[in-house]
């Protein structure tokens, strides 16, 4: 068995779910990948089971997928990116590949649904999907969990996932959320100070905007975010 998973929180969570449901925790079978890596360097045997989770194939990488099909590999492809869905529409022969291609949920949540179609996904999987798809239906827990889990090792086979999937999951997820809440509080206070001292108004194409010269994300705008059209 080989498992290819995307190198972000969603992909790592998806990879962890493959390990949990298949019972295969062999590190030599798991490969964290991005979109510039050459997947063909990974040795895959003819007829082998191959999982791609939270991974988007495109026209220039399609040959690898087709080569696995031709070699009789049992492929499971789970992804939520629009590029994957468009690729399947453009190549009907890909529709027969097992898995789920659906833009309504993240790769991790789709992976859970694939293995447990009638089960209710754990809260942490919902938080991962909520953040990755930018839906934020479970805020503030979504952001707190994301920040909290980034304080520990969270690769696909790291212990954090087995703890989150274990009997003590409530205390584990609670600890991560509390940790994330503390981090977010610090970030917000730091952003407030920086914005209050260094932000200034300007215009872009005639539209009033607030400018903050800092390498950061939109959190730096705080409550000002909704006061400007840009």
Regions found by a protein language model. Give the residues of each.
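Accessory alpha-helical/coil subdomains and C-terminal extensions
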Residues: 138-197
């Amino acid at each position: 068995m080989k498992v290819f998973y995307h190198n972000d929180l969603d992909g790592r969570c998806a990879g962890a779910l493959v390990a949990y449901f298949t019972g295969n925790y062999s590190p030599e079978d798991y490969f964290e990948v991005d979109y510039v890596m050459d997947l063909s360097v990974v040795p895959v045997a003819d007829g082998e089971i191959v999982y791609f989770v939270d991974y988007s194939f495109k026209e220039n990488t399609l040959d690898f997928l087709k080569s696995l099909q031709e070699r009789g590999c049992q492929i499971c492809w789970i992804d939520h990116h629009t590029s994957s869905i468009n690729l399947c529409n453009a190549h009907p022969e890909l529709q027969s590949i097992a898995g789920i291609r659906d833009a309504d949920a993240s790769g991790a949540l789709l992976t859970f649904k694939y293995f447990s179609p009638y089960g209710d996904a754990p809260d942490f999987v919902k938080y991962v999907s909520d953040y990755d798809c930018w839906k934020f239906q479970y805020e503030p827990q979504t952001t707190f969990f994301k920040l909290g889990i980034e304080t520990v090792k969270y690769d696909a086979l790291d212990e954090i996932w087995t703890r989150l999937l274990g009997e003590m999951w409530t205390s584990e997820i609670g600890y991560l959320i509390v940790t994330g809440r503390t981090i977010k509080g610090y970030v917000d206070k730091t952003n407030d100070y920086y914005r209050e001292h260094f932000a200034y108004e300007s215009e872009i194409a005639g539209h009033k905007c607030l400018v903050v010269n800092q390498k950061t994300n939109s959190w730096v705008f705080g409550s000002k975010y909704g006061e400007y059209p840009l």
